[in-house]
Amino acid sequence: SPDSRYFAMTVSDDRAVKELWVINSMAHPRPTLETYKYQMPGEKEAPIEHLYLFDLVDNKRKEIKVAAYKDQSIGLEYKPMMQKQRDMEDQPSIWLGDNNRFYLSRKSRDLHRIDICSYTVGQDSIVPVIKERMNTYQETRPLHLLSNGKELIQWSERDGWAHLYLYDDKGNLKNRITKGPWHVEEILKVDNKARVIYFTANGMNPNENPYYEHL
């Protein structure tokens, strides 16, 4: 958390997952056998992910209820790193939100269902804020906050292209920010005061290599 009282952590329970073996041919003087947990397609044994909140003042740990989909995955959202922090050896890891609330994503294994969720300290479970549903694989990008957390900028492929959408903190869509037959790649900076977003995009010019990025 920004005030360092709490920290959230995801834990993957792989005990039921079967092992996979590979040969490390670069080992010296002879190749070695490497073993790790890996779920093959069609296998029922899958990692189970848990979310914990730790209180460093009260010295307590709490597991937060996150279950929704079979073989789901969860991922915490983090505050964007400042430019001066990019070259630091020990980079800060601060959750996206305020001292008592943070955001995370919850995804089904086939990535057809993605929930942007929030958690407020004191609750027992997370709360879905934005729900994405598609019959194809979806990608995601980091969430961004505006107006002291009262607004959210979400990257979504819902119309077949990657674009930005503005929501309030209750999950109500206010408006779409970008539109067109091109792809928003990454948000670089958000000017909260001027309400301006600096981002990179691909495919802006149909006669140009689509891998060329524009700012």
Walk through the language-model features, giving the residues of each:
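Beta-propeller blade signature
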Residues: 49-57, 117-124, 166-170, 213-215
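Glycine-enriched catalytic-core subsegment of oxygenase/oxidase enzymes
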Residues: 162-163, 173
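Predominantly five- to eight-bladed beta-propeller fold
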Residues: 1-79, 213
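Beta-strand C-termini and the immediately following turn/loop, strongest in propeller blades
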Residues: 8-14, 42-45, 93-98, 103-110, ...
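Short coil/turn segments at the loop-to-beta-strand junctions that recur within blades
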Residues: 68-71, 132-138, 180-185
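Structural signature of eukaryotic scaffold interfaces centered on beta-propeller domains
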Residues: 1-3, 84-98, 142-148, 189-192
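A short beta-strand motif characteristic of beta-propeller blades
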Residues: 62, 79-83, 127-133, 173-178
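Beta-rich catalytic cores
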Residues: 47, 89-91, 112, 139-141, ...
